[in-house]
Structures are given as structure tokens and as C-alpha cells.
Regions:
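N-terminal binding-site loop/beta-alpha segment at the start of enzyme catalytic domains
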Residues: 1-14, 75, 157-158
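Active-site phosphate/pyrophosphate- and oxyanion-stabilizing loops and adjacent acidic/basic residues
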Residues: 3-4, 38, 93, 179
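Short acidic capping loops at alpha-helix termini that bridge into adjacent secondary structure
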Residues: 9-13, 47-51, 80-81, 102-105
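A short, structured active-site edge motif that brings together acidic residues
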Residues: 10-23, 107-112
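Active-site mouth loops of central-metabolism enzymes
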Residues: 19-34, 55, 60-61, 127
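Short, acidic/polar
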Residues: 26-45, 65, 89-94, 134
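Active-site groove signature of glycoside hydrolases
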Residues: 41-62
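Beta/alpha (TIM)-barrel catalytic core signal, keyed to glycine-rich beta->alpha loops juxtaposed to Asp/Glu
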Residues: 57, 61-185
Length: 185
């Protein structure tokens, strides 16, 4: 138990958690989401989460059922805001079609050394690999819909590349700048 969850302490925190990923498969069913949230709240010794993310898209989910479960959790005061992780534009549109409140966040892989989301917007109409629209315009879509982009693995070079922190051979200048800023602030 890391924190005493007195109301005065809890009010100063933003608690976020994820659900819909299990051993072997993804599960965005209403029953799984409800149980997952109850379990999370019990483990954290709190009455509510500020943000709940659906962790990875469940391609076989019933979006109406999933949205209804999320709305019920909101009505019960168990979750204030909802988001997703690694959802495409159309996956968010499909879920949002059935939700009353807007999605608050999409947690995506992005870092100083992993920038495909940014690159595809800067390479429009250019004959280079980065101009291929792999995400369907995910970053500008999130901006347009006012969905916050939250980084996962913000210190990674890519999914398998490891961290750029301490990699002086490939990212020496970046590490030097980070060290300078860290000592300053």
C-alpha cells in the first residue's frame, strides 16, 4: 500500500488504469470491464478512477455493449473519463458512436526517438517512406476531436529498440540535452 487514500489525499491525484486485455486475448465485454474496474478500485483502495482506458482494441467487441458498460460506470461514479490505447480513427469513431461522453485520451507509442505519428503529417505529398499514411491521420484526428494523446513508452526508440536513455552512441546529443535540462530543473 503506497498511499493512504484519505479523501484529502485522493483529491490531489489523477488515477488512471486500463482494462480489456487478458491472457491470450482482448476482452471489451461489459462483464469483463465491470469486474476489472471493481478489482482495480479494490486494489487501489479508492471509490473511483479519474481515467479508464481500454487497452488495445478488441476487434470482436460489440461497441454498443462496451459503450453501455462505460456509461454505466460513469453514472455509478466509478470512472470520470474514458479513453483508449492504440485505437485507430475508425475504432474510436465506432466506439464513440455509442457513447454519450467524448473519449478523453488515446494512449499511443510516441517518443523523441519514435515519431511516426508526427512524421506522416510532415511528409505529406513527398515521395518518401514517412509520407505513407499508416495511421489514417490519427494525430490530426485526435487534435480535431480534442482527444488527448498520451505517450506510452516515452523513452523507447521503437517497440523492440529499447530505451534511448543512456544510448550515447546513437543518441548522445539527446542524452546530453536531457542531462542538462534535468540538472537545471
Amino acid at each position: 500500500k503506497a498511499v493512504d487514500m484519505k479523501p484529502s489525499v485522493r483529491e490531489k491525484m489523477i488515477l488512471q488504469s486500463k482494462c480489456s486485455i487478458r491472457d491470450g486475448y482482448y476482452d471489451a465485454s461489459a462483464a469483463y470491464i465491470r469486474k476489472a474496474v471493481d478489482d482495480i478500485l479494490a486494489r487501489l483502495h479508492t471509490d473511483y478512477l479519474d481515467i479508464l482506458l481500454l487497452h488495445r482494441p478488441d476487434a470482436l467487441m460489440d461497441p454498443g455493449e462496451t459503450a453501455e458498460a462505460l456509461e454505466r460506470l460513469h453514472e455509478q461514479g466509478k470512472v470520470r473519463y474514458f479513453g483508449v490505447s492504440n485505437y485507430s480513427v475508425m475504432q474510436m469513431e465506432l466506439l464513440q458512436k455509442y457513447m454519450k461522453q467524448p473519449l478523453f485520451v488515446n494512449q499511443l507509442q510516441i517518443s523523441l526517438a519514435h515519431t511516426p505519428l508526427i512524421d506522416e503529417g510532415m511528409a505529406v505529398n513527398m515521395d518518401i517512406d514517412q509520407s505513407v499514411l499508416r495511421t489514417g491521420g490519427l494525430l490530426p484526428y485526435c487534435q480535431f476531436k480534442e482527444i488527448n494523446v498520451q505517450a506510452w513508452s516515452p523513452y523507447q526508440k521503437g517497440f523492440f529498440g529499447g530505451s534511448f536513455i543512456g544510448d550515447l552512441e546513437e543518441y548522445g546529443e539527446l542524452n546530453s540535452l536531457i542531462d542538462t535540462l534535468a540538472s537545471k530543473y
